[in-house]
Amino acid sequence: MVTVGIPRALLYYQYYPAWKVFLEKLGAKVVVSAPTNKSILNSGVARGVQDTCLPVKVFFGHIVSLVDKCDVMFVPAVTSLGKKSYNCSKLIGLPNMARALIPESPPILAPEINCEKGRYNLYRSIYGVGRYFTSNPFKLKRAVEEAWASNLDYRGKMSDEGITPLQAIDCKLSPDVNPSSFTIAVIAHPYISYDEYISHRLIPQLQKKGVKVVTPEMVSPEELDAATRRLVGVPHWLFESEIIGAGEYYMETGVDGIIITSAFGCGPDSMMLGMVQHRARELSIPILPLSLDEH
């Protein structure tokens, strides 16, 4: 049985359930790196180049931690999931950067997910990964279908139940009990909010103080997309709705304040942050921007 390593960083928080189902249905054993700690962070910082943002450095650290634990590494290159909407260049280039900066890594499986190239290219990329494990096209088709169903179930649980990715992955289907009516929206990409080491446990700390915390994942993708379009029109950045859409949605529905967290040096986030801050000032909603790096 082939053991596949999945780094617990970046797109793990959006797609891990689907990846796990897909790989296991193909007969692979999935191993996930441990939650981020000082050792993982230091390993990633040592491998990252100067202009690499904190989340990508953390990702490299997770790959290093998995080197001796798996036969292959799963690092998709997610380029685009919608028309003329693109991912950050560093996330697009993750597989190539990982190969260059971590030469001791086992082989990297890097399907290109680029909806701009059409459905045929997407299928060819996914089936190319599947052929690494099986030559049975029916087994591969079932794995794809079950992975997609798992992804829909995962997103539905978070928005319907009002729970976080960590709760959904751990099958804790009830939101944290918090009688407080004081509500703070914590707006950030999941790989920042739910990595408790680099976020300094921001969400648990707020909940400990009796604050009701709401996040982008607790809103349906359709509502986030609609809110994004109301504020800026057609989105151009992949996952733009996690920042702009969530900010607009929660400002419209009513929160007592917003904490918006980003990685220092992130170009796309710096533009999105400015838009949300401007909108919050218009509506007189308190907003606290936090910028994170490895120092």
Regions found by a protein language model. Give the residues of each.
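An N-terminal assembly and electron-transfer interface module characteristic of large anaerobic redox
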Residues: M1-H295
